[in-house]
């Protein structure tokens, strides 16, 4: 990602990234730092945050890390407050943290799975977006919100029931916020990755046989898996002034899988 260093499109900006210690979130943190931004990386995994801080030590005080449970409203709101206190401002928030559901179709899903997915994948995005909009409105200078949805937020057969519902809701929230606040200089967009080489599926110890068969229809041989770096490049573009007239959009990054 060294090309970002030669094109510091986020110089002088401050970004908050949830799920920032691994996978797509970690790549976004690194990409944004290389593009000149200061970053607050938030994650539930303290060990991973410490490792991230050590790995990116060259950025010094431009990188702060904080343990956050994104399903907890106070944690999310405190995260934004910390960024403002540490860096003096917040210009960008990336609501990226998320979990999967073992590709469970509705008949195999219990209430606990549904409620957990909604808390982490949807409520967290609402908390972060609401806090950001309130801050941006008070500051009066606009701002950028990027929500990590999924191909499953556009194509209903690519994931489990709870995961798909949560990501469709993220897309709807994104578009509503974009329209409601377009006249304030606030931009709100979503990235929709397809299959990507991250650890989000680590918890899927026993994926549903039916769900797996249905969700992967049309995938075999159609395209390779994406890399976190390919997703973070799209996020950096949306965060920059180069995307200044892009608002309320869902940017699909899936190598063509959704064309099936």
Curated annotation (Swiss-Prot):
Its EC number is 1.1.1.-, 1.1.1.391. It catalyses: 3-oxo-5beta-cholan-24-oate + NADH + H(+) = isolithocholate + NAD(+); 12alpha-hydroxy-3-oxo-5beta-cholan-24-oate + NADH + H(+) = isodeoxycholate + NAD(+); 12alpha-hydroxy-3-oxo-5beta-cholan-24-oate + NADPH + H(+) = isodeoxycholate + NADP(+); 7alpha,12alpha-dihydroxy-3-oxo-5beta-cholan-24-oate + NADH + H(+) = isocholate + NAD(+). GO terms for molecular function: oxidoreductase activity, acting on the CH-OH group of donors, NAD or NADP as acceptor. NAD(+) binds at residues 43, 69-70, 96, 163, 167. Pfam families: adh_short_C2. GO terms for biological process: bile acid metabolic process. InterPro entries: NAD(P)-bd_dom_sf, Sc_DH/Rdtase_CS, SDR_fam. Involved in the modification of secondary bile acids into iso-bile acids (3beta-bile acids) via epimerization of the 3-OH group through a 3-oxo-intermediate. Catalyzes the reduction of 12-alpha-hydroxy-3-oxo-5-beta-cholan-24-oate (3-oxo-DCA) and 3-oxo-5-beta-cholan-24-oate (3-oxo-LCA) to yield isodeoxycholate (isoDCA) and isolithocholate (isoLCA), respectively. This is 3beta-hydroxysteroid dehydrogenase 2.
